[in-house]
Regions:
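Short helical (or helix-break) motifs at transmembrane helix termini and adjacent helical loops
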Residues: 116-131
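Membrane-interface alpha-helices at helix entry/exit sites of multi-pass transporters
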Residues: 137-149
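Hydrophobic alpha-helical transmembrane segments of multi-pass integral membrane proteins
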Residues: 27-33, 58-96, 100, 112-120
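Conserved small/polar residues in nucleotide/adenosyl-binding loops
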Residues: 190-195
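Short amphipathic alpha-helical coupling elements at transmembrane boundaries
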Residues: 11-22, 48-56, 130, 142-145
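Hydrophobic core segments of alpha-helical transmembrane domains in multi-pass membrane transport
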Residues: 1-2, 33-38, 68-76, 116, ...
């Protein structure tokens, strides 16, 4: 900016200082989030807990995709990372699914990915959430709470889909169709409520 004479050196330094002041809060939140995620992952032995929980529940195989979705969401929300949850759960889920119900292996892997991304999206300690709120210039917790409504709606529809795919032993069309149908009902209810509020 200075060589092209878009701004003077004083303007550049003033803007640089203002920009750094805006990023200090985000940087501190990000460092604390990484610390909390590391504590959950390493000191609290969350991966060991998840593996033991899956192997010892004794639940029927039909509930495996839904259970994996919930566990992935919980783990990702707790640690603030979807990729870390992939790395923790995928090596655990593959042998567990093959031993309990091999037909649901792909559904269980899909549930792992979807639950991890959902948990990461809703987590207040996720780096993507922190940087998104900082980039948009909004309060961090306000950003989390406004995103939660939409994410929980889609997660609820997905959970129903994973229950159906487990019960029907892998019927993808019925599961996907039911999830989309329920999501459409939510959208219709929401738009009708919004239209009533505007009148």
């Amino acid at each position: 900016y200075i060589p092209r004479k878009i701004m003077s050196f004083k303007e550049f330094m003033d803007n640089f200082t203002k920009g750094m002041q805006q990023m200090i809060t985000s940087g501190c939140i990000l460092m604390l989030a990484w610390t909390i995620g590391g504590v959950c992952r390493d000191l609290l032995s969350t991966p060991v807990f998840v593996k033991t929980f899956i192997e010892t529940t004794g639940l029927p195989g039909a509930l495996l995709p839904a259970l994996v979705f919930i566990l992935a969401a919980f783990l990702s929300f707790s640690t603030g990372t979807s990729w870390g949850t992939f790395g923790i759960l995928i090596p655990i889920i593959i042998p567990v699914a093959q031993s309990i119900c091999p037909e649901l292996l792909l559904s269980s892997l899909a549930a792992t990915l979807a639950g991890s991304v959902f948990g990461d999206h809703c987590s207040p300690i996720s780096d993507t959430t922190i940087l998104s709120s900082a980039g948009a210039g909004v309060n961090h917790l306000t950003h989390v709470s406004t995103q939660m409504i939409y994410a929980l709606t889609v997660a609820g529809c997905s959970l129903i889909g994973y229950l159906i795919i487990g019960i029907t032993n892998g019927n993808l069309l019925l599961s996907l169709g039911t999830s989309i149908f329920i999501l459409c009902i939510f959208c219709l209810l929401y738009t009708s409520d919004a239209a009533d509020d505007m009148q």
